[in-house]
Amino acid sequence: IWPDAARRIWEITTEATALVKEIVARRAISCDLTEGYLEAGWRARDEADARAYAAHLRDRYGCATIRAVPAEEMRARIASPAYVGGLEDRAAGHLHPLNYALGLARAAAEAGARLHERSEAVALEPDGARTARGRVRAEWTLLACNGYLDDLDRAAAGRIMPINNFIAATEPLGERARALIPGNECVSDTRFVLDYF
């Protein structure tokens, strides 16, 4: 059963990526959606691992959007000598998360959803959620939280490990950013505690 489950998980992730792109286009959400992702290897073995993984994805899942990137090409695509090859995924990418969330909220409101900002859910109930100051009744409830669920959903909280995440924001870097990552891909590396930018 495991190969079938793995294939279904793969299909769900590719469907989710396509859905985000479709929603952005259909709802005209201005969120700087940009295709292209690089996973930059930093250990000598990462280049060979990337080749093997890209071949596995191609052979097992028919994935034609992910390919291995040799070390010399990776150094040209990320202006750093630190990386030794890796992967490129042309179907993945990045966007401005706040602008995307605002666009989704606008689209939901236009479709008739009622949004309840600053209404922290303290308990999920069969017909909605209880907040610190009232109740929200709903046929469907979507649990979309960070890793700190506490009593909101004990079963999910026991399966999620919160992690530290640090982000620095600057004013737009313009040409300086284009000189560092000419293709404007999003990048993460293969460290255990990874860097991403």
Q: Whereabouts are the PLM-identified features?
A:
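Well-ordered beta-strand positions enriched in small/hydrophobic/aromatic, beta-favoring residues
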Residues: G86-E88, A129, A168, F197
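Short, surface-exposed, polar/charged, turn-prone segments marking secondary-structure boundaries
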Residues: R60-Y61, I66-P70, H94-P97, L115-E117, ...
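Rossmann-like flavin
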Residues: W2-A107
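Short acidic, glycine/serine/threonine-rich loops at helix termini
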Residues: R51-Y53, D127-G128, D153-A155
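A conserved short coil-to-beta-strand element within the FAD-binding core of flavoproteins
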Residues: A68-S80, A113-G128, R135
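Active-site substrate-recognition segment that forms the wall
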Residues: A18, R26-T34, A121-A123, G134-F197
